Amino acid sequence: MLEQMGKAAKQASWQLAVLSTAKKNQVLSVMADRLEANSEAILLANEQDMAQARATGMSEALLDRLLLTPARLAAIANDVRQVCRLNDPVGHVLDGNLLDSGLKLERRRVPLGVIGVIYEARPNVTIDVASLCLKTGNAVILRGGKETHNTNQATVKVIQQALEQCGLPAAAVQAIDSPDRALVNELLRLDRYVDMLIPRGGAGLHKLCREQSTIPVITGGIGVCHTYVDADVDFDKALTVIENAKIQRPSACNSLETLLVNRSIAAEFLPALSAKMAAAGVTLHAAENALPLLQGGPATVVPVNAEDYDDEWLSLDLNVLLVDDIDQAIDHIRTHGTNHSDAILTRSLSSAEHFVRAVDSSAVYVNASTRFTDGGQFGLGAEVAVSTQKLHARGPMGLDALTTYKWIGYGDDLVRS
């Protein structure tokens, strides 16, 4: 099954690789229009997935990721249109030179070829990934979780109709429909056809892909994100940033999970934090050194467990720990962080610069919410994933991350001497 799917994807990728930007944008425009025109069918399919997920006891955090609403679907269609407006990186000359031999050499961006994406309860990924892959001339094989089966079928059908309407093969965007887990292992070894693999899910999925794949893997998206509140800080501004980072969308991988507070301001800052978090229904998981200052406050407070520092809450829960100084905060982030997104809130330029240099995450913020780690917020359009590794891409993966390059040499019947 996957052998034929891979072969068809590879053949489709050859057609996509030579498309003009105008043609690719036409496909995306038709795709966005069809998503809106078929919204009723897509939302009905999503309702079926939601009902099955609730019946199996899926957590509220994952249910939120699975849910499509009319507003969310409209926003996704608009994201596709935004990809149309982005510059096409394919064909861009990165650098070049005229060599002493007379050879004119240039390094030019080209598509990767075929990209495989494995993901869980995230139906928006189907559309986001397809739009970015098509813009960059890549074919894609999608393997969504069983939780999104009906939604994925409905959206892939719409995407394939858009491709065929524009005279392109439906095999440019394919989905593995079967929930059989053995097919995941088969996909991981489809290196004859698939050029890059991106898993979007939990730590178990990432571990499986790293250990079993014969295809280069880009991992990331697991976000144990921290914010350090420095001794020199504006309380009101800091609380506003913390509120946004934790509350805006707690199920997102860039939401705040652990707050590190300088001990010297804790007696004054933590009561204000408690009031702010209580208003939003956040449960504070307090370290032993923070517990006495939070107990008796308006927020719900429980003692933190050691393992809580290493896991994503993805909910209205927040770890709170006091640290002696910025270096202790950095040590904690190095020990428990996932290299996703971490922030410092401070009025000290020297502290900010020290934090930025020392924290080795894909996105580091000064006086800003970790929620900004997002392809759209970065001006990249919808993202394929957020990479927390250093090769071949890092941070939100937009269009450039879905390309590689080739060397092209021009000569006049030139031979090497």
Curated annotation (Swiss-Prot):
Keywords in alphabetical order: Amino-acid biosynthesis, Cytoplasm, NADP, Oxidoreductase, Proline biosynthesis
Pathway: Amino-acid biosynthesis; L-proline biosynthesis; L-glutamate 5-semialdehyde from L-glutamate: step 2/2
UniProt xrefs under CDD domains: ALDH_F18-19_ProA-GPR
Tagged with keyword Cell division: no
UniProt GO molecular function: glutamate-5-semialdehyde dehydrogenase activity; NADP binding
GO process annotations (BP): L-proline biosynthetic process
Catalytic reaction equation(s): L-glutamate 5-semialdehyde + phosphate + NADP(+) = L-glutamyl 5-phosphate + NADPH + H(+)
GO CC terms, sorted: cytoplasm
Principal location: cytoplasm
Coiled coil regions, renumbered to chain: none
Highest taxon in the source lineage: Bacteria
Known function: Catalyzes the NADPH-dependent reduction of L-glutamate 5-phosphate into L-glutamate 5-semialdehyde and phosphate. The product spontaneously undergoes cyclization to form 1-pyrroline-5-carboxylate.
Protein family according to the UniProt entry: Belongs to the gamma-glutamyl phosphate reductase family.
NCBIfam families: PRK00197.1 (NF001221), proA (TIGR00407)
Protein name (record): Gamma-glutamyl phosphate reductase
Native source species: Serratia marcescens
Source taxonomy: Bacteria, Pseudomonadati, Pseudomonadota, Gammaproteobacteria, Enterobacterales
